[in-house]
Regions:
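Long, contiguous internal "core" modules enriched in hydrophobic/ aromatic residues
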Residues: 1-322
Length: 322
């Protein structure tokens, strides 16, 4: 890789003891044993995102290297662990949402034909169905003989895969894109089974045009795809902006009233929306309570965590639970 001559030189690598002394010299309280364990297991760079709010800010809003009084490495570890456990909870919820979307697409697209998902009548004129099918074929090829069902349909049916078989090798991004490509009528039918009903009659002509162009659920599935992939790659959820999802047309739905006005781009908005979907998919689920309690007890009790870093707005109250 060619180096840009104008670029600054990279900082030299440092040892764990050097990193500990650097943190201490900048004003952080550090227990050597705890810090050594975490800096070796997780690395300085990965942890640095979690101590960022503890850095001092000067009068011109410039972030300095030094830490604010009271900065403690133990709090950084607690925040990192809270984020890791939140990823586990999100992954668990997304599994059920992903399977639920697959099943609804199967019911719609394969009602009369196992290969109905290949018929253009279900899709918008601008949707690249051929491109989507090529991408799906690559998923099938990668699964190959290691997937019993794929291997069976390849040998017995000449490589023709009903959607209920194909969907098992697709990821959430694949099925989300397929949903985005559906006609508005098809999108609305599926959305209603998730408890997302848009009253077009209550909208202005321009608003109806916007909703028909892209159903709000498609916007949310796009965001949830990124959230899911962030979890799959062990990325940070706290204090991070995701692709925004419009809230304008869903805030009238019971359970979604407290979403931010206009759009939502932080993890708590995604949590609220997931909770709504999961209450439909699995009535009586304990997932919303578990996530609410985790956020209240493990995030909001830490000194450097502000509610807005999670996307919790002034009209949302999170109470600690057991």
């Amino acid at each position: 890789m060619k180096r840009d001559e104008q670029a600054r030189p990279l900082k030299p690598p440092t040892s764990v003891p050097e990193q500990i002394e650097l943190l201490r010299s900048r004003g952080m309280a550090v227990d050597d044993e705890l810090a050594s364990q975490w800096l070796e297991a997780v690395l300085y760079y990965r942890l640095s995102a979690y101590w960022y709010p503890l850095r001092r800010v000067d009068t011109e809003e410039h972030v300095e290297d030094g830490f604010v009084p009271g900065a403690d490495f133990a709090d950084v570890v607690a925040l990192y662990e809270a984020d890791r456990k939140l990823r586990t909870l999100i992954h668990d919820g997304m599994e059920r949402i992903e399977v639920g979307l697959r099943s609804r697409l199967t019911s719609l697209l394969c009602r009369d034909n196992a290969l109905g998902y290949q018929e253009r009548r279900f899709y918008r004129s601008g949707f690249d169905l051929d491109g989507w099918l090529r991408a799906a074929r690559r998923r099938v090829d990668r699964a190959g003989a290691h997937n019993t069902a794929i291997d069976h349909y390849k040998k017995q049916y000449g490589g023709q895969y009903p959607f209920w078989v194909l969907s098992e090798v697709l990821d959430f991004g694949d099925v989300s894109k397929l949903y985005q490509g559906l006609t508005y009528k098809a999108q609305a039918q599926i959305a209603e089974t998730f408890g997302i009903t848009i009253d077009l009659g209550a909208l202005s002509k321009n608003e109806r045009k916007i909703v028909r162009r892209r159903h709000p659920l498609a916007s949310w599935f796009e965001q949830l795809t990124i959230v899911r992939n962030t979890c799959a790659h062990h990325g940070r959820l706290w204090n991070k902006s995701f692709v925004p999802a419009s809230t304008k047309y869903v805030r009238t739905i019971p359970g979604l009233e407290s979403l931010p006005d206009g759009q939502s781009e932080r993890i708590y908005g995604a949590v609220l929306f997931m909770a709504h979907l999961l209450n439909i998919l699995s009535p009586g689920t304990s997932w919303p309570v578990k996530v609410n309690n985790h956020i209240a007890n493990c995030f909001l009790t830490l000194p450097m965590v502000k509610a807005h870093s999670l996307g919790i707005t002034s009209n949302q109250t999170i109470h600690p639970g057991s």
